[in-house]
UniProtKB/Swiss-Prot annotation:
E.C. no: 2.1.1.67
Protein name: Thiopurine S-methyltransferase
UniProt keywords, alphabetically: Cytoplasm, Methyltransferase, S-adenosyl-L-methionine, Transferase
Enzyme kind, highest EC tier: transferase
Highest taxon of the lineage: Bacteria
Pfam families per the UniProt record, alphabetical: TPMT
Positions bound to S-adenosyl-L-methionine: 10, 45, 66, 123
Compartments it resides in: Cytoplasm
Length: 218
């Protein structure tokens, strides 16, 4: 899986992963992080998720990172926003009010771009990556975050042999294997969602659940 895979999906409109509303699990569990309003929240592989607007409405500053210029443009256009723009080594920056999106490769981020992020919201990033890329993703995106950073991680679990990702199945054992060395991991919720995801059932998936984790940097 390379950058062209994701760029092509946006160009062709193959974006079934994009939700048309704010994720209810975010609204339900975000306050468990107990963040100050002024906290800056990193949203890796953000696409054009409406969750960023919700986070901004809570008083947070939001930093999204997205590879596709089309996704970034659509995010601001659909909100009727005209962002200011500038370039850096990390990519092209789009800024409107409390929301900033860096259009660039998350795997090429400079640590300085994340220096003032005190929280991370990962709904569609970790599950978008095959197993062989996840450790590198943590080293690139999570490791540079400040000590005692907070996070909300949302994953999917299903029999991986029944469906090719993305999104990929990331079960609790794998979450702990990835995060336990640097993060305290607490599962906040785990529930079956197969009835709410007919596209998975149509592809022959026999079981599907989602899990929500609170992360606390050590």
């Amino acid at each position: 899986m390379d950058t062209n895979f994701w760029l092509e999906r946006w160009q062709l409109g193959h974006t079934g992963f994009h939700q048309q509303e704010v994720l209810p699990l975010l609204q339900k569990h975000w306050h468990a992080l107990d963040l100050p309003k002024e906290a800056r929240v990193l949203v890796p592989l953000c696409g054009k998720t409406l969750d960023m607007h919700w986070l901004a409405a809570q008083g947070h500053r939001v930093l999204g990172v997205e590879l596709s210029p089309l996704a970034v443009t659509q995010f601001f256009d659909e909100a009727g926003l005209q962002p200011q723009r500038h370039s850096s080594a990390a990519g092209e920056h789009f800024i409107a009010g409390p929301i900033e999106i860096i259009c660039g490769d998350a795997f090429a981020l400079d640590a300085s771009a994340l220096a003032d992020c005190t929280a991370v919201y990962d709904r569609a990033a970790l599950v978008a990556l095959p197993a062989e890329l996840r450790q590198h993703y943590l080293q690139t995106v999570y490791a540079p975050l400040p000590t005692h950073c907070h996070g909300l991680l949302i994953t999917l679990e299903y029999p991986q042999a029944e469906k090719a990702g993305p999104p990929f199945s990331v079960d609790a054992t794998h979450v702990h294997a990835l995060f336990d060395s640097a993060w305290q991991v607490d599962q906040l919720e785990h529930r079956d969602i197969l009835d709410q995801e007919p596209r998975f059932r149509d592809e022959g998936v026999t079981g599907l659940s989602t899990a929500v984790y609170r992360l606390q940097g050590r």
